[in-house]
């Protein structure tokens, strides 16, 4: 019985690691920030934040994290994108769920796509890497 619990525990750890890798990762093919997206300062990294009106996690979790990062870190552009109203962008970045975020480097190329909620530490790490 103890062996089964141990095997199940190991399986769950691997499942959590795999899930984290799936949700957040480097983009395989770099996509350039579309020209129609206006940013305040093109020399800074940019985060596209995909949300919808009926997304509770967008309002209660992801948006507060992004606002907090904006206040503390400040060195990036934040662009809100309604996933329903922006079909082209949603398709371009293969957004499957909301909230989702796409992090672009200073040169406008996509670096990370986070499907689902991305916590402050993960986004901060991605923004630091996108600056270089």
Model-derived features with residue positions:
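Short helix-loop-beta junction
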Residues: 66-76
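Short active-site neighborhood of thiol/selenol oxidoreductases, capturing the structured segment around
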Residues: 41-53
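N-terminal targeting signals for export/organelle localization
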Residues: 1-31
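Conserved redox-active cysteine motifs that mediate thiol-disulfide chemistry
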Residues: 52-64
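Structural micro-motif
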Residues: 93-102
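Thiol-based oxidoreductase modules, predominantly thioredoxin-like and allied folds used
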Residues: 74-87
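Non-catalytic, surface beta->alpha helical segment in thiol-disulfide oxidoreductase systems
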Residues: 104-132
């Amino acid at each position: 019985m103890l062996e089964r619990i141990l095997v199940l525990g190991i399986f769950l750890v691997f499942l959590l690691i795999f899930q984290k890798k799936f949700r957040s990762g480097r983009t395989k093919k770099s996509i350039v920030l579309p020209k129609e997206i206006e940013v305040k300062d093109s020399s800074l990294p940019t985060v596209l934040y995909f949300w919808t009106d009926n997304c509770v996690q967008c309002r209660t979790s992801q948006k507060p994290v992004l606002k907090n990062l904006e206040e503390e870190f400040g060195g990036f552009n934040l662009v809100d994108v309604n996933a329903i109203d922006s079909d082209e962008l949603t398709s371009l970045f293969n957004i499957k769920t909301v909230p989702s975020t796409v992090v672009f480097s200073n040169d406008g190329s996509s670096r990370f796509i986070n499907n689902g909620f991305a916590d402050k530490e993960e986004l901060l790490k991605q923004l630091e890497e996108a600056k270089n």
